[in-house]
């Protein structure tokens, strides 16, 4: 992944304002829109130490996550008093396994992830600059089985008003990135995101948090 030091430094300095302490209510509300089955395998790209992993593991037999930072993954298991089995796969990746959870550390684009039926993306696409997002979408679709579904949470604002991350990913770009898939917006909230500080909010002329259901063709 390009500029990995940016994220390594964020975790090392505990500058993780993007981390939610609780399960994302949008996940709880909209996951059922994917018509998920317990046996279907789930992928969470750029998962951090998200509480969403726990929620998903209670719904599914296999949840894979990929996270660049070892600090994040080790913190996740330590904070939940889990003792994972750790395997060094190669110079770039480690594998952490505990019950339904399988987490890889290292670059998402090269991690040896198994193909999956479902993808949950709350903080991956919006964490990437525009020049990386096409490659990211291609990688996700490569890992997604035919007929697989994605629940995507995105943000839409005037990019020149905020440097990001999180970055703005407007509707037109999402439809282009996932061209050939069925793309449906199932939610749009135009109130300012409570995770943005007041100074940032004051500089935005508009803001929308959006949820998308994306289905890969059979």
From Swiss-Prot:
Disulfide bonds: none
MF terms in GO: thiopurine S-methyltransferase activity
Broad class of the protein's primary localization: cytoplasm
Cellular compartment(s): Cytoplasm
Cited Pfam families: TPMT
Superkingdom, taxonomy of origin: Bacteria
Catalytic activity: S-adenosyl-L-methionine + a thiopurine = S-adenosyl-L-homocysteine + a thiopurine S-methylether
Gene3D superfamilies: Vaccinia Virus protein VP39 (3.40.50.150)
NCBIfam families: PRK13255.1, TMPT_Se_Te
Protein name: Thiopurine S-methyltransferase
